[in-house]
Amino acid sequence: MAGHPNTDNVERAARLDTTALSDALDRLGIAGQCLGIKPLDPNFRLAGRAFTILYGPSASPSGTVGDYIDDVEPGGIVVLDNGGRADATVWGDILTWVAHERRVGGTVIDGACRDTHLARQLSYPVYSRSYSMRTGKDRVQVEALGGTVNIGDARCGAGDILRGDADGVIVIPRAHENAVLDAAEEIDKIEDEIRRAVQDGISLRDARARHGYHSLQTRKK
């Protein structure tokens, strides 16, 4: 399928479920599934480009957990790599409130957040590996902004597209976004055709066979 140079790819991603995007990534041999990263609320949705932050252990003298939120553009997705740590949170109520006020698109954390009630109250999308009450101050600090980070089993660079829904989060690498979105749109279309075929009286087995359902995600050679 051809690319869509006149269509914003974030909007294209927002129209797709993470399941179709995951199958497209499998087909292309790209590891973009952020396994283990879940929404605080299954109704949360996000789609936007990544603003990446890497955390490390607190040094002496201690650095800070970061004031980067002032630099995140509206619609951007804050992506925090804290190495999956559950013992030191890197996102809380002040950041949630400021991000919501500034129309940031959401937050994705390989690690823990806290003050989860406010994210739910404001319907501000937060996806994380865990949550806790324990602060990250004096335990972790920002090491780098704008680099490539790890989120679950995926690598995420600044400007990559993230798409989140009730099933989790997908990273769409910037270098491959047209190919991934084209494949996901094709998969989504075929699944709709299967549903219509069943509505018309065809058996699910025959509808799936007709449209190659069982190999939609198979890597192309």
Task: Go through the PLM ranges and name each one.
Residues 165:
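Beta-strand-loop-alpha-helix segment that lines the small-molecule cofactor/substrate pocket
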